[in-house]
Each structure stands twice: as structure tokens, then as C-alpha cells.
């Protein structure tokens, strides 16, 4: 990697805007904000570049409407894609409708990555992410350790926050794992939740939280995106922060353990499919895939999550 990382945001919408700001605040590298909307990324880049002063940073932020600016990127973050089916009302479409539309975008982006930055570390955000990350992996030809999908970092941040609020503790003191898939099939692992290193079961035993309250928190975690949308907003700040945590671990070789969608090669009994599991992300990309020991019920839910990803992939 060059002394200063080149980070290209493919998609400069709401998530892209927050990501660019966080990159400057952390002084992670130079940013290219790419989008197909003419001039828009240039305006956002100009605005964001001014925050260098307040952040005591020195990051170049530029806008682009051409894929040529992917050239020699160190990190590529892909948020581009449809979030709903065009021409259909909210009641007329479902996530399956996005598959052919976003697959075309992955084909296009993958070709440009292959030609311009085949050694970059790729983070895929486009939904359904566990399918799209596999498609972009195929279309770009990047090594399996150089591409991951957003999922568990965001999902667990929500779960950790809700638990911390119930127990009145610092959110960072809650540790939790969500594996399998990003979406309704995510697998929340109650057995692995700790608070300050103490198993959550101790807090249940001491009546600080009940199983029913925990189940409600699980349900809220799964449905958080819908909750935000129903409040006439859009989830983009926390997703952006989760993505930048992943990128920073790669750029700065932090070797953080982060839950992301990665290519399974026998873990959990599955091969040639992307799914969420803890990873060590460092300067070489995915440096270790951590397979958690699941009980029968957890394994059944994990298998169902993978089956849903396989079903969607088969529709393309």
C-alpha cells in the first residue's frame, strides 16, 4: 500500500457522504467520491474537503463521474445499487426484485476493478449483501481475502447498543456475535454475549434483564432498518461508521476481529458461499476466518441463512 491510502467510494449518496467525512476525521487517506450522478460527487467532495481544517487532517477529497479514477485504489467501498425496484410501490416489490438490477451493477463495477485496481481491498454494502459480495468477487477476480461484505459489524452494533441501554452500561463493554446473513435470517448467538467479560446469563440470573426482554431486543435488532424507515428516515450514519471501522482495520493493519460476510471454505459445513462470521482483518485483508462452535439450534438457523442466500443467488 502507498504511504497514503487511496480510498474510492463507488456510490456517493448518504452513506458515501458520511464515510468521506469519517475518513477525513480519522486521516485515513485520500478519498475519491464516485457516482453516476453528474457533478453531485464533486460538490460533496468540495464540502467534505473543508473539514480537513477542523479535523487537523490532510486528506485530498475529490469527486468523479468516471470509473477511470479507480486506478491504483487501495480500498474500494461499493454502496452503488438499487434499494427498491423502480416503478413499483412499496407493497409491490421485494428484495428478490433487486437481484438482476444490482447484479448488472456488480458486473460493471467488477470489470473496472479488474482493470484498474485488482489488488484493492473491497468492501461491499449493496443489498442483498451476501449475494452481491459473491457476485462482485466473481466479476472482479480479486482474491478471496481481499473482499468482504458489510453485515455483522453493523448488526452487532445495534444489538450491543440496545443491551447496553437496558443494563445501563457503556455500549463498548457489550460483546456479541451475529452470524449467517445480513437481513431477516441473521443468527443472534445469545450464548456468546458478554458484558464486561461477564456472560449475559449472569445478568439474567440476577434479574437485570429477562429472557423476554432479550428476545424483544433480538427482534428490534433484526427490524432496526425498517424501524428507522418507518420514522421517515434512512439508516446511513451507523452503516457508514461500521464500514469505516472495517476499512481502518485494513489500512492501519489493526487486526481487529470483525464480523463480516466472507467466502466459506468448509466452515460451518458450507463451501463456495459468502456468509457472516468473525474475521481478523489486517494489512493483508482477511487474515483469519474464525468458525464459532454452534449448538444444534444455532447450526439449523445458520444453515437456513445460507440456504436463503443460495436461493437468491440461483434467481440471477
From Swiss-Prot:
It holds the Pfam family Ldh_1_C. It is an enzyme of class 1 (oxidoreductase). It comes from the Eukaryota. GO terms for biological process: glycolytic process; lactate metabolic process; pyruvate biosynthetic process. The active site is at residue 182. NAD(+) binds at residues 13-15, 34-36, 67, 79-83, 125-127, 150, 154, 182. It catalyses: (S)-lactate + NAD(+) = pyruvate + NADH + H(+). Pathway: Fermentation; pyruvate fermentation to lactate; (S)-lactate from pyruvate: step 1/1. Substrate binds at residues 95, 158, 182. The keyword rRNA-binding does not apply. GO terms for molecular function: L-lactate dehydrogenase activity; NAD binding; oxidoreductase activity. InterPro entries: L-lactate/malate_DH, Lactate/malate_DH_C, Lactate/malate_DH_N, Lactate_DH/Glyco_Ohase_4_C, Malate_DH_type3, NAD(P)-bd_dom_sf. Belongs to the LDH/MDH superfamily. LDH family. Homotetramer. This is L-lactate dehydrogenase. It comes from Plasmodium berghei (strain Anka). The gene is LDH.
Amino acid at each position: 500500500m502507498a504511504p497514503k491510502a487511496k480510498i474510492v467510494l463507488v456510490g456517493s449518496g448518504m452513506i458515501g457522504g458520511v464515510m468521506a467525512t469519517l475518513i477525513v476525521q480519522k486521516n485515513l487517506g485520500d478519498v475519491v467520491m464516485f457516482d453516476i450522478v453528474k457533478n453531485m460527487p464533486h460538490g460533496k467532495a468540495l464540502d467534505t474537503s473543508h473539514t480537513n481544517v477542523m479535523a487537523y487532517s490532510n486528506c485530498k477529497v475529490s469527486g468523479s463521474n468516471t470509473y477511470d479514477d479507480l486506478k491504483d485504489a487501495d480500498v474500494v467501498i461499493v454502496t452503488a445499487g438499487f434499494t427498491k425496484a423502480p416503478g413499483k410501490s412499496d407493497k409491490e416489490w421485494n428484495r428478490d426484485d433487486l437481484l438482476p438490477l444490482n447484479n448488472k451493477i456488480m458486473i460493471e463495477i467488477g470489470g473496472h476493478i479488474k482493470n484498474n485496481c485488482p489488488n484493492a481491498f473491497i468492501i461491499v454494502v449493496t443489498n442483498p449483501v451476501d449475494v452481491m459480495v459473491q457476485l462482485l468477487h466473481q466479476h472482479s477476480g480479486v482474491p478471496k481475502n481481499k473482499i468482504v461484505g458489510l453485515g455483522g459489524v453493523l448488526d452487532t452494533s445495534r444489538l450491543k447498543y440496545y443491551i447496553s441501554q437496558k443494563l445501563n452500561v457503556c455500549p463498548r463493554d457489550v460483546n456479541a456475535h451475529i452470524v449467517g446473513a445480513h437481513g431477516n435470517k441473521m443468527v443472534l448467538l445469545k450464548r456468546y454475549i458478554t458484558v464486561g467479560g461477564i456472560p449475559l446469563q449472569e445478568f439474567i440470573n440476577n434479574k437485570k434483564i429477562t429472557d423476554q426482554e432479550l428476545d424483544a431486543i433480538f427482534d428490534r435488532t433484526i427490524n432496526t432498518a425498517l424501524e428507522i424507515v418507518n420514522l421517515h428516515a434512512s439508516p446511513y450514519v451507523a452503516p457508514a461508521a461500521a464500514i469505516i471501522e472495517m476499512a481502518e482495520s485494513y489500512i492501519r493493519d489493526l487486526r481487529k476481529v470483525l464480523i463480516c460476510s466472507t467466502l466459506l471454505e468448509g466452515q460451518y459445513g458450507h463451501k463456495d458461499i459468502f456468509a457472516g462470521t468473525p474475521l481478523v482483518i489486517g494489512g493483508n485483508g482477511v487474515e483469519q476466518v474464525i468458525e464459532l462452535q454452534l449448538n444444534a439450534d444455532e447450526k439449523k438457523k445458520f444453515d437456513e441463512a445460507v440456504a436463503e442466500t443460495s436461493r437468491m443467488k440461483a434467481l440471477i
